[in-house]
Amino acid sequence: MLTFHELIGFMSPKMANQILDDTQANNREVYRALVASIAQAQKMRPLFIGRQPKERRHKNFVQMLSRAGSEEHAGNLIRGWLFKEHKDVLTEFLGKLGIEHEEGMVDELPESIDDGPLNEAVDLLLEKYDRELVAVYLTAFNASNENRWENLDTMLADDERLQLHG
């Protein structure tokens, strides 16, 4: 039952840096918005933050995004990264569950999902993709879902394969 800012705090530094690196390289609009919001929160100019060495800047971003007040920015960053860099994970999960989507975009999710199909879909993702990526995706998916699926929350809390060890 992690929120987006908690997810940033619990993921490995390697994963957090990968998200920021990919976003900086491939989703400049989201990255610029992030720089502007961090600058405003720290009462600095965006130009000053942009001139910091990337390693230091990204470390500061992770610290800021891990705070409760950064939920919206953390959510935008993670969702944007998943849609831009890992659409295949989204489409495979939704497809395995039989949920209609358009390239990972869903108009309406079911209020709940049966355990059997959910377990099969999660097992499929874990067979094909990095364990931490799957945990980040499933956590983000449920955090974005208006009707959180209780069985997915339980699985994220109890299944050792889906634990974040940041």
Predicted regions and their residues:
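Short acidic DE-rich linear segments
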Residues: 160-166
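Charged, amphipathic alpha-helical stretches
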Residues: 2-33
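Short, aromatic- and cysteine-enriched interfacial helices/patches
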Residues: 4-11, 47-48, 97-99, 162
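Acidic, low-complexity, intrinsically disordered interaction modules
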Residues: 25-151
